[in-house]
């Protein structure tokens, strides 16, 4: 019986952020596999090394820098015709030394929003999404008063929120569109992105569409035809089956919930961090932990393989 277990080559890679937020990329030599394409710097983990040790060594050898601060970002498994790789990606937010191509390779700094315009090896594309997403995602509560809602949203944007899921299930279609347009304009003025949850019509100016777990199983036309190039697709998931369905339809990122008990459903069954980590491990896109989350849980979510946390109450109230 043939062996179907894939042997992945463990490779570490870095999303290196400068003080201005730009990201450092290296260009692969023309004579190498995927030559000429841009990549996130890194290399193979050697026997006996931890991923962080391997990353630190590779970045010093390739770029002449010493890693001072790094945290896990995403793991991506990809099978090329030449072999399979596990990309163990870390976000480097502090380093010493001046980055340069010690092996003669071109290196350059790019704005995060420039990354989708560049050519990368196929395994790198989920990393681009992760690099463009923040660690916090605000899901808006049901709007009661439009003016108060926008004032509160502005306060959260001023506090640093850069990803918003606009949710307004009780508004009429016209009121939804009007308030969503105002929210998008406001968010964009802060450089933030807005995903629309169950909009009556998809808005061109929105940054993407967020699906409920029920909509995951809808006809494809519901979630594909409204999207223009560059708009994201995300989804709410509650178990491995739904997360796999999200992968099958090509979401860019997802929420997995409930991770911890919530104030709204204190006695409900929750997944816990162990299940979160094991489930996230099965997919190649960023996943936010949702349910009982506040900012103190970001580090735990990242260590568990997640992008960060999504929340309504705690992020709306500024916890």
Task: Go through each PLM region and give its residues.
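Active-site-adjacent beta-strand/loop module that shapes the phosphate/pyrophosphate-binding cleft
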Residues: 76-98
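Conserved Nudix-box catalytic region and its N-terminal flanking loop in Nudix hydrolases
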Residues: 22-62, 73-74
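Conserved N-terminal beta-strand and adjoining loop/helix that marks the start
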Residues: 2-23, 75
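Glycine-rich phosphate-binding active-site loops on the catalytic face of alpha/beta enzymes
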Residues: 213-223, 253-267, 292-319
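Glycine/Thr-rich beta-alpha phosphate-binding loop at enzyme active sites
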Residues: 205-220, 231-281
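N-terminal active-site wall of soluble small-molecule enzyme domains
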Residues: 163-226
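Alpha-helix-loop-beta-strand connector modules within alpha/beta enzyme cores
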Residues: 179-195, 221-239, 269-294
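NUDIX/MutT-family hydrolases
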Residues: 89-91, 99-132
